[in-house]
Swiss-Prot record:
Species in which this protein is naturally found: Glycine max
Protein name in the entry: ATP synthase subunit c, chloroplastic
GO annotations of cellular component type: chloroplast thylakoid membrane; proton-transporting ATP synthase complex; proton-transporting two-sector ATPase complex, proton-transporting domain
Family of this protein: Belongs to the ATPase C chain family.
Topological relation to the membrane, as annotated: Multi-pass membrane protein
Length: 81
């Protein structure tokens, strides 16, 4: 195995996980903050807001998991070797 390809794969795997978690992390923080603000304004809508929040958090977390899958593919099933 070429050491340059191995090193590039490890760096790319780290970047895949790191960059794939930045956007969802910011989005989840913003969504949670807005949900808390919405519940503070309308406590009677807490159940509906919480359900929508949990669904949207799951979709955001899926993006991070996709980055993890790409990183694992680069580390263990490297298509460049």
């Amino acid at each position: 195995m070429n050491p340059i390809i191995s090193a590039a794969s490890v760096i790319a795997a780290g970047l895949a996980v790191g960059l794939a978690s930045i956007g969802p992390g910011v989005g989840q923080g913003t969504a949670a903050g807005q949900a808390v603000e919405g519940i503070a304004r309308q406590p009677e809508a807490e159940g509906k807001i919480r359900g929508t929040l949990l669904l949207s958090l799951a979709f955001m977390e899926a993006l991070t998991i996709y980055g993890l899958v790409v990183a694992l593919a680069l580390l263990f099933a490297n298509p460049f070797v």
